[in-house]
């Protein structure tokens, strides 16, 4: 098995730069988030994690960008269904939200050469036909949205992959891990791990911080969520969700979400205590969660802000952020932090009843966590094997 190089000096630089000295705001930082203690390795120098991506949609492309720039990962192969190499290069290079890729992208036959790194591309529909073993892929980002159970993803394992990470909530009881919240739950015991959803990643770090200190008796979550590719450009048809069939760019659309309930998968102490809903709004990236909850112990709003800031600068750095500046959604575009608490937006009715607000880039932030989870899984596997 191939291992990856330790890049401690880069992690130190990332940690040092994560907060602007003149502000409490966490700025955009396209560097690996600080890994939890459970993911740290000791021993000999390692090589980059050999990675592959199945599916080249919004998340697949952004995970690819992040992997190419991260020395802890080596992207070997992307399977993109029917997309030609030329079109894949175009999709990779240009992005309406995150801008033009800052680097070289060259097509060489069926391969992409990105910043001098060769990435094999394939166009198989069935996982058993992709050929991961031929390129040495060991850790796979399953990003098609189709193979989201252990049974459906098993052909990836049969084809030579060691572990499959779902970039979406699993549709079975596969292990769910939110980095910065329950990374220690992975001990090498399974081949299939879900990174949950972007909204669960945006909510869970805040829930953990608050529940650890004061306890949460009950809570309601609302996510004000940017448009996604599942929505209609103009009024269309949706038998399952009539409102969801309306034009995304011209409406605020109430919708359902399982993100709040899913937090219980990574924080069992809040099982049965949280639920939520979504409003889909006409913006193309960045979302915000509103957590209204009843606390088990008294807390002033100032105490809550201080605790979130402490954790954001401490053991949850890279996953939980803090800002006390008057920011808006576009200020969080291409922000890698999972969840940035907005101290100026929240309110408190009394010491037990509070409304807390946190921003998240539902594309870039989540894609960083998918990459982080793949690296974490590889580190744990290496430690278990050793």
UniProtKB/Swiss-Prot annotation:
Gene3D superfamilies: Dihydrodipicolinate Reductase, domain 2 (3.30.360.10), NAD(P)-binding Rossmann-like Domain (3.40.50.720). GO terms for molecular function: glyceraldehyde-3-phosphate dehydrogenase (NAD+) (phosphorylating) activity; glyceraldehyde-3-phosphate dehydrogenase (NADP+) (phosphorylating) activity; NAD binding; NADP binding. The keyword NADP applies. InterPro entries: GlycerAld/Erythrose_P_DH, GlycerAld_3-P_DH_AS, GlycerAld_3-P_DH_cat, GlycerAld_3-P_DH_NAD(P)-bd, Glyceraldehyde-3-P_DH_1, NAD(P)-bd_dom_sf. Its EC number is 1.2.1.59. Pathway: Carbohydrate biosynthesis; Calvin cycle. Keywords: Calvin cycle, Chloroplast, NAD, NADP, Oxidoreductase, Plastid, Transit peptide. It comes from the Eukaryota. The record marks 225 as: Activates thiol group during catalysis. The active site is at 198 (nucleophile). Residues 1-45 form a transit peptide. D-glyceraldehyde 3-phosphate binds at residues 197-199, 228, 257-258, 280. The keyword Oxidoreductase applies. Signal peptide: none annotated. It is found in: Plastid, Chloroplast. One of its GO terms (cellular component) is cytosol. It catalyses: D-glyceraldehyde 3-phosphate + phosphate + NADP(+) = (2R)-3-phospho-glyceroyl phosphate + NADPH + H(+); D-glyceraldehyde 3-phosphate + phosphate + NAD(+) = (2R)-3-phospho-glyceroyl phosphate + NADH + H(+). Pfam families: Gp_dh_C, Gp_dh_N. Homotetramer. PANTHER family: GLYCERALDEHYDE 3-PHOSPHATE DEHYDROGENASE (PTHR10836), GLYCERALDEHYDE-3-PHOSPHATE DEHYDROGENASE-RELATED (PTHR10836:SF76). Belongs to the glyceraldehyde-3-phosphate dehydrogenase family. This is Glyceraldehyde-3-phosphate dehydrogenase, chloroplastic. It comes from Guillardia theta (Cryptophyte). The lineage of its organism: Eukaryota, Cryptophyceae, Pyrenomonadales, Geminigeraceae, Guillardia. The gene is GAPC1.
């Amino acid at each position: 098995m191939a291992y990856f190089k330790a890049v401690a000096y880069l992690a130190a630089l990332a940690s040092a730069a994560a907060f602007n000295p003149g502000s409490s705001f966490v700025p955009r930082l396209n560097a690996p988030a600080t890994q939890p203690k459970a993911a740290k390795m000791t021993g000999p120098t390692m090589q980059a994690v050999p990675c592959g991506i199945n599916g080249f949609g919004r998340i697949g492309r952004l995970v690819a960008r992040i992997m190419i720039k991260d020395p802890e990962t080596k992207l070997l192969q992307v399977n993109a269904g029917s997309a030609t190499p030329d079109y894949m290069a175009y999709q990779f290079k240009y992005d309406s939200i995150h801008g033009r890729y800052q680097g070289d992208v060259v097509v060489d036959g069926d391969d992409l050469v990105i910043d001098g790194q060769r990435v094999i591309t394939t166009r198989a529909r069935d996982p058993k036909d992709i050929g991961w073993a031929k390129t040495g892929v060991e850790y796979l980002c399953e990003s098609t949205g189709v193979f989201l159970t252990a049974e459906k993803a098993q052909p990836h394992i049969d084809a030579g992959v060691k572990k499959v990470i779902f970039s979406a909530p699993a549709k079975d009881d596969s292990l769910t891990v939110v980095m910065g919240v329950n990374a220690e739950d992975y001990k090498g015991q399974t081949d299939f791990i879900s990174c949950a959803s972007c909204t669960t990643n945006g909510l869970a770090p805040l829930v953990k911080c608050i529940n650890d200190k004061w306890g949460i008796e009950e809570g309601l979550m609302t996510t004000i969520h940017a448009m996604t590719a599942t929505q209609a450009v103009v009024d269309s048809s949706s038998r399952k969700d009539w409102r969801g069939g309306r034009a995304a760019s011209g409406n605020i659309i109430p919708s359902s979400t399982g993100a709040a309930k899913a937090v219980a998968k990574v924080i069992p102490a809040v099982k049965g205590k949280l639920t939520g809903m979504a409003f889909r709004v006409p913006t193309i990236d960045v979302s915000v969660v509103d957590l209204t909850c009843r606390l088990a112990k008294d807390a002033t709003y100032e105490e809550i802000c201080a605790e979130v800031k402490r954790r954001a600068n401490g053991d949850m750095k890279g996953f939980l952020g803090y800002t006390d500046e008057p920011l808006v959604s576009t200020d969080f575009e291409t922000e890698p932090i999972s969840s940035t608490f907005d101290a100026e937006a929240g309110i408190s009715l009394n010491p037990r009843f509070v409304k807390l607000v946190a921003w998240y880039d539902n594309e870039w932030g989540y894609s960083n966590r998918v990459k982080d989870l793949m690296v974490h899984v590889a580190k744990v596997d290496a430690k278990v094997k050793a």
